[in-house]
Amino acid sequence: MPTKRTSTTTTKKVEEMNPTEKITVEESPVEVEEDFNLEKKVTVRSIAEWTTGFQRIETNGDVTIPPNGTVRLSRGEIISQVQNGNLLFTGIDGQGSHATLYIEDKPTRIEADFETESSPQNVINKEHIDNLFNIKSMKDFESTLHSMVVTRAEKYAIMGFIRKGNFNDYNKVRAVENYTKLQV
């Protein structure tokens, strides 16, 4: 049985329209809450200078990530790895601090409880290294270095950033070499 449609129109006939009348359109930003799709593939980046890998949980097989490389994994696989305590993702504290593998998708990091909307995950990156080398006091530099660089992967990563970044402060580079026991 067909349904009866009733509609109202808000359009004016062309004859009624004033050509000098300004038409305003209200624009209001609407936040669209995206459903958290566990099948969506997201990028995972390794900070390690060596090949890393782990066994998949949700499907058969292994994941192999090349040195300083990336791989695309489903959100479901990442959440499963985190919930099973994979240290490559969870880092030294279980909250993603000083992790070897960094999830480049913010909603997935939030779902894994690695960060919130206001506080980012504690992981080494180029911006943190630049801020470290902008510290004026050598004492503050060393204390920040010791809190920022904890794991073996981070020690190799900071040396890679120094090689690529052309940092000119000899004393700070030597302090990093002494701490990491690696040479630039």
Model features per residue range: what roles?
Residues E117-V184:
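Charge/polar-rich, low-complexity and marginally structured segments
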